[in-house]
Amino acid sequence: MKAARFVMRSASSLSSASLVPREVELFSRYSPSPLSMKQLLDFGSENACERTSFAFLRQELPVRLANILKEIDILPDRLVNTPSVQLVKSWYIQSLMDLVEFHEKSPEDQKALSEFVDTLVKVRNRHHNVVPTMAQGILEYKDTCTVDPVTNQNLQYFLDRFYMNRISTRMLMNQHILIFSDSKTGNPSHIGSIDPNCDVVAVVQDAFECAKMLCDQYYLTSPELNLTQVNGKFPGQPIHIVYVPSHLHHMLFELFKNAMRATVEHQENRPSLTPVEATVVLGKEDLTIKISDRGGGVPLRITDRLFSYTYSTAPTPVMDNSRNAPLAGFGYGLPISRLYAKYFQGDLNLYSMSGYGTDAIIYLKALSSESVEKLPVFNKSAFKHYQMSSEADDWCIPSREPKNLAKEKLAV
């Protein structure tokens, strides 16, 4: 309780500061500027200019933070006032304030450039637990009131945008930190977190091994992997694209984990497990990865729920005060993975056959020039989305007790 009161006081003091509303309002008037993978590579090339990156980020990061802060403010009051959402909001406001300070500093000032890197590290660390903390806020809100279908739809809309915003700001900060920090901790073959020659099959195999190790620990068994690769663009050559390996690994690990769990539980009485199939295909425009299992599939009515932030098959976790807050059980694995795919104009879809198995397909852009950030912007269209009211369905809804036509008398 003391921690909660401290959070509320901290957030309240930040919100009441005269500078904060003005700065949030100011930067929210600008639309975010999406970058392509090619532009991100150019920022980190051998001729990369730290001053140019500094000048761009000191404007762009506050714009992205302010845009999503405006959306937080139009959420239901009971949700915004939960301790967890107040904490997240205070983090975003404080980070925006930290970054705005660099507007008065010259890109030619080497000390300012060094301090900017330190500030980005501080902001990144501050936002470390944003995902589970916001998830906890949703749970706190749902504990206080009944969530109607329209509100639930708005929450899904907001969380997709909120977490996509977080992915994008984290990407920009990581790029600058990894490229311009004095301590070079990144992979020497990468440009920041981007691999210009990402070996897709190697990432698939690594993600599978990580999921397999987890499956073995929990179930004491796991299915094998059957991997097929087809390079339709350059037949016979390995499949490489420009991509962020950590993003791809995140998606694949989630899909393999789900496929293994379904396979083991569905085939627990069989002498051997059916392998999980992975198919990697590079075309002229798209890279497609299909993960197929024989885990029994799911009914059609459940398929859409799998991408809902309010649906999970795992027990609801309990938050504590540690930095390592749990994420499993919030139901965020698939929806967050889909956001990673969509971030650079890709997608992630599920196709299930109940009683047989599931195909999960990741679509990514094959060309770095077409891999452009997909960013939320707070404008009139976004505002109107939150104002939608519940309307009567324009399709007939079957009654639980259909009329018995045999008893109906024909009108003469």
Curated annotation (Swiss-Prot):
All residue ranges annotated as the Histidine kinase domain in the record: 138-368
Coiled coil: none
Site (Interaction with the other subunit in the homodimer): 157, 161, 395
CDD domains with a match to the protein in the record: HATPase_PDK-like
Binding residues annotated for ATP, in chain numbering: 254-261, 293, 312-313, 329-334
EC number per UniProt: 2.7.11.2
Gene Ontology molecular function: any one: ATP binding
EC class: transferase
Deletion consequences: No visible phenotype at birth. Mice have lower blood glucose and pyruvate levels after overnight fasting than normal, while the levels of ketone bodies are increased. After 48 hours of starving, their rate of glucose oxidation is increased, and glycolysis decreased, compared to wild type mice. Likewise, their rate of fatty acid oxidation is lower than normal in response to starvation. In contrast, there are no differences in blood glucose levels between fed mutant and wild type mice.
Transmembrane segments annotated in the record for this chain: none
Chief location bin: mitochondrion
Gene3D superfamilies noted in UniProt: Alpha-ketoacid/pyruvate dehydrogenase kinase, N-terminal domain, Histidine kinase-like ATPase, C-terminal domain
Keyword field contains ATP-binding: yes
Enzymatic reactions: L-seryl-[pyruvate dehydrogenase E1 alpha subunit] + ATP = O-phospho-L-seryl-[pyruvate dehydrogenase E1 alpha subunit] + ADP + H(+)
Compartment list: Mitochondrion matrix
GO cellular component: mitochondrial inner membrane; mitochondrial matrix; mitochondrion
Stored InterPro entries: AK/P_DHK_N_sf (IPR036784), BCDHK/PDK_N (IPR018955), BCKD/PDK (IPR039028), HATPase_C_sf (IPR036890), His_kinase_dom (IPR005467)
Record keyword Transferase present: yes
Subunit structure: Homodimer. Interacts with the pyruvate dehydrogenase complex subunit DLAT, and is part of the multimeric pyruvate dehydrogenase complex that contains multiple copies of pyruvate dehydrogenase (E1), dihydrolipoamide acetyltransferase (DLAT, E2) and lipoamide dehydrogenase (DLD, E3).
The family this protein is said to belong to: Belongs to the PDK/BCKDK protein kinase family.
Protein name: [Pyruvate dehydrogenase (acetyl-transferring)] kinase isozyme 4, mitochondrial
Organism: Mus musculus
